[in-house]
């Protein structure tokens, strides 16, 4: 820790989002905040392939992906590889608690997205989040 700042445990993020504007905004916000966006994909097969390739600290996934893809399949792949997933979606699926660390409901702004990632990181480390943005539900450590 240097000057009160913790080293981030979440550095490399995969974005699975089929809405181009949302995907672009998320990618831009994360990069500006110092995260490495491993990839931005819009389909289940592309997300699963990236997850299987390793070196991802967090997946941000919409539930509805292109070609009728289901983000819950992305969540299952992430879970199988030990990678936490945060759903970023308009409606949190009923089975989300079994698949993900949490849900951030759309619409959300860049500050809320970054605060949600910080809250996920705190939760994974066993700490209480400093701030929970509106629309964020966390399933571990609730």
Describe the residue ranges of each PLM region.
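Conserved acidic carboxylate
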Residues: 17
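Short amphipathic alpha-helix used as the core "switch/output" element in two-component signaling
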Residues: 69-83, 92
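A Lys-centered signature of the CheY-like receiver
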Residues: 106
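Two-component/phosphorelay signaling modules centered on CheY-like receiver
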Residues: 20-39
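Acidic, metal-coordinating helix/loop segments flanking the phosphotransfer/catalytic sites
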Residues: 27, 40-58
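Active-site residues of response regulator receiver
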Residues: 62-63
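Non-catalytic signal-transmission and effector/linker regions of two-component phosphorelay proteins
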Residues: 1-12, 45, 97, 110-142
């Amino acid at each position: 820790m240097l000057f009160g700042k913790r080293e981030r445990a979440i550095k490399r993020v995969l974005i699975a989002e089929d809405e181009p504007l949302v995907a672009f905004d998320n990618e831009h916000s994360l990069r500006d905040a110092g995260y490495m966006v491993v990839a931005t994909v819009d389909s289940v097969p592309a997300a699963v392939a990236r997850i299987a390739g390793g070196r991802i600290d967090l997946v941000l996934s919409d539930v509805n992906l292109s070609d009728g893809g289901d983000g819950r399949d992305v969540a299952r792949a992430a879970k199988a590889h030990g990678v936490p997933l945060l759903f970023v979606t308009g409606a949190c699926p009923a089975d989300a608690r079994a698949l993900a660390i949490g849900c951030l409901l759309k619409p959300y702004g860049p500050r809320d997205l970054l605060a949600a990632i910080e809250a996920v990181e705190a939760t994974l480390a066993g700490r209480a989040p400093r701030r929970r943005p509106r629309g964020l539900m966390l399933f571990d450590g609730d």
